[in-house]
UniProtKB/Swiss-Prot annotation:
SUPFAM superfamilies named in the record: DNA breaking-rejoining enzymes (SSF56349)
Domain Tyr recombinase: 85-248
Family according to the record: Belongs to the 'phage' integrase family. XerD-like subfamily.
Residues of the active site: K149, R213, Y245
Database matches in InterPro entries: CB, DNA_brk_join_enz, Integrase-like_cat_sf, Integrase_catalytic, Integrase_recombinase_N, Tyrosine_recombinase_XerD-like
Taxonomic classification: Bacteria, Bacillati, Bacillota, Bacilli, Lactobacillales
Main location: cytoplasm
Domain (Core-binding (CB)) ranges: 1-72
Protein name from the UniProt record: Tyrosine recombinase XerD-like
Source organism per UniProt: Streptococcus pyogenes serotype M3 (strain ATCC BAA-595 / MGAS315)
Amino acid sequence: MKSYIEPFIASKALSQNSQKAYRYDLQQFCQLVGERVNQDKLLLYQNSIANLSLSAKKRKLSTANQFLYYLYQIKYLNSYFRLTDTMKVMRTEKQQAAIINTDIFYQKTPFVWGQLISLLILELGLTPSEVAGIEVANLDLSFQMLTLKTKKGVRVLPLSQILIPFLEQQLIGKEVYLFEHRGIPFSRQWFFNHLKTFVRSIGYEGLTAQKLREQFILKEKLAGKSIIELSDILGLKSPVTLEKYYKS
């Protein structure tokens, strides 16, 4: 199984530092699990990282899950195995969610629909209903802008350069909506299922649309946006729901 580490790393667009981290984590994983993967060995690996910090544990689980999925794709494994963090983390009201490393969200994946849904939430802070309502006519990729029309009003949101290729790929053949079938928007359940499948494939099972939107809020606050500015970006009637993120 160790011989597949380098081909796996080569299949992903990673920086030099990320390659080193992936290589280190996977060498440890393979050393403990060995050449034959089964649930007992995976449980052994989970126990071996149980006392690490939450961020380190999440990173190792994510890396191992990506590798396991890769091995399943290339038919090295006959079954799809997956590691889950069974440790429950207790939080007090004073504790806030931490900003996660989102590099993996931009990497190549077979789950392109779920990926784009998650990126639109991460990059723009959209709700699932706002994502579903994106119309082709309101996307201007040349000027990198999205005009979002909702019952609350109209917002013009800038599109980052990194988001453009993902949008270009999915705009091909669309008639009315970005997410549609022959001009008819997909159902709410369709969005839920595709988002769930994608985040699970990259090791973030349980990461909901609400939590992804929270990541946008945390990053915008960190970038220096005031509570009023952020409220306007999100199209909120009042900044009250954002107050918990701005408490010292």
